[in-house]
Design a protein with these regions (language model features):
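Coiled-coil dimerization/phosphotransfer module
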Residues: 1-178
Length: 178
């Protein structure tokens, strides 16, 4: 019985770890815009590569499943930039227009051969699958001048959660989003 309890405790810890990994706590604490700002700041401190973040204040605009997808894409892209790009600067731009939510992550690094990478790693494939799950478009353009990831998710995929009146410019709204 004691062994079963120990195994159950380990299993519960693993479920907790997985669930925290699936939905980052930082999203609940800060909201998407500030969570992106936070991981960009951490990236800059760690790598000494400046990151410019352009974003609207998305106060209760996007559902958790979209926030998690976008956050994970930024997280994975920054990891790839740190490991491979040799970039001197990074741009992260998030915007919401009438029909599309768009996320752009761009660096000025050394670039890579997309076809060669797709067969080796699962990171980029996982990102594309996350976006396609929301009926979105995931594109990567890379050259010796850098790499640009563009994610477009139709607002129709979260239309029941979308309320354009909740979009505020960061310049007009300095409060933390919740």
């Amino acid at each position: 019985l004691k062994s079963a309890q120990e195994h159950l405790a380990v299993a519960i810890q693993e479920v907790r770890r997985i669930s925290h990994h699936m939905h980052p706590q930082i999203l609940d604490e800060l909201g998407l815009s500030e969570a992106i700002e936070s991981i960009a700041s951490d990236f800059s401190k760690r790598t000494k590569v400046p990151v410019q973040v352009n974003k609207p204040a998305l106060r209760k605009l996007l559902p958790d499943f979209i926030n998690t997808t976008l956050f994970r894409i930024v997280q994975e892209a920054l990891t790839n930039i740190q490991k491979h790009a040799k970039a001197k600067s990074v741009l992260i731009a998030l915007s919401v227009e009438s029909d599309w939510l768009t996320l752009i992550i761009q660096d000025d690094g050394v670039g890579f051969e997309i076809a060669r990478t797709q067969s080796k790693g699962i990171g980029l494939r996982n990102l594309a699958e996350r976006v396609e799950h929301h009926r979105g478009k995931f594109t990567i353009k890379s050259s010796k001048m850098g790499t640009k990831i563009t994610v477009k998710i139709p607002t129709a995929s979260f239309v029941n959660h979308f309320n354009e009146s909740t979009i505020h410019s960061d310049k007009n709204d300095n409060n933390n989003e919740r």
